[in-house]
Amino acid sequence: MPKVSIVEKSQFFAKAVVEGVPPSLINSLRRVIISELPVLAIDSVVVVNNTSVMYDEMLAHRLGLIPLTTPLKDLPPIEDCESGLVDPSECTVRLTLQVNATGDVVVYAGDLVADRPDVAPVYKDIPIVKLVEGQSVVVEAYAKLGRARDHAKWQAALASYYYYPKVVVKREECREMCKEVCRNLENPLECTFNKATTCKEMCGGGIVVEWEKDKYVFWIESFGNYDAETALREAFRILKKKFEDFLDALSRKAEAKL
């Protein structure tokens, strides 16, 4: 029976011990989190005026890499946006950037203004370009829902896991030898499998390192587009839909042979 124990949780980070699931399933979840989660990112830019020293192309590139808050519950499912089931405007948000320098000034991500109040740069202090007196930047940008499998600017989070290690200390002097690498050898959350293996190599046969089958330490960290819990829920939704689509395709194939 699958079991999950939360070890650490904050707005943008979560760590848990997961038991009773095969590695293929937990790895599928990891891959969905890394490459399939939808987020808003600037995808097209209209440069109205740019008298800064930065080329228009470089300016557009920088704007595209600024993470934006993404209110998933108020946006269509990414599948509907990709398939054209909804109007493209429902999957797009317009942003403007207008800065006229009256002295030396730095243009920041926080100067971007979206048409929607629930969409804004996650980190407002990201510098975009420097201006001197008399220079200006006026830009109209369009952010759309996308996935990291198409471009890294649409990546919402990182996720990883490692097997739950089981460490047996046969010689007490090994604890002192491994103190700098791992202070508590028997604590799998503090002493990861890699750290335990390093200690094993340092101490020879004084430490035995194994792992528990179908038990892992899993963590996820959001880039701030939405919180870690939302990222996990969306990842499970996408993974479930993939299974459903696979079963539907399999059923149609079987029916066609009858």
Swiss-Prot record:
GO terms for cellular component: cytoplasm; DNA-directed RNA polymerase complex. It is found in: Cytoplasm. Its EC number is 2.7.7.6. It catalyses: RNA(n) + a ribonucleoside 5'-triphosphate = RNA(n+1) + diphosphate. Keywords: Cytoplasm, DNA-directed RNA polymerase, Nucleotidyltransferase, Transcription, Transferase. It comes from the Archaea. Pfam families: RNA_pol_A_bac, RNA_pol_L. The keyword Metal-binding does not apply. SUPFAM superfamilies: Insert subdomain of RNA polymerase alpha subunit (SSF56553), RBP11-like subunits of RNA polymerase (SSF55257). Its main location: cytoplasm. InterPro entries: DNA-dir_RNA_pol_30-40kDasu_CS, DNA-dir_RNA_pol_insert, DNA-dir_RNA_pol_RpoA/D/Rpb3, RBP11-like, RNAP_Rpo3/Rpb3/RPAC1, RNApol_insert_sf, Rpo3/RPB3_RNA_Pol_subunit. One of its GO terms (biological process) is DNA-templated transcription. One of its GO terms (molecular function) is DNA-directed RNA polymerase activity. Part of the RNA polymerase complex. DNA-dependent RNA polymerase (RNAP) catalyzes the transcription of DNA into RNA using the four ribonucleoside triphosphates as substrates. Belongs to the archaeal Rpo3/eukaryotic RPB3 RNA polymerase subunit family. This is DNA-directed RNA polymerase subunit Rpo3. The gene is rpo3.
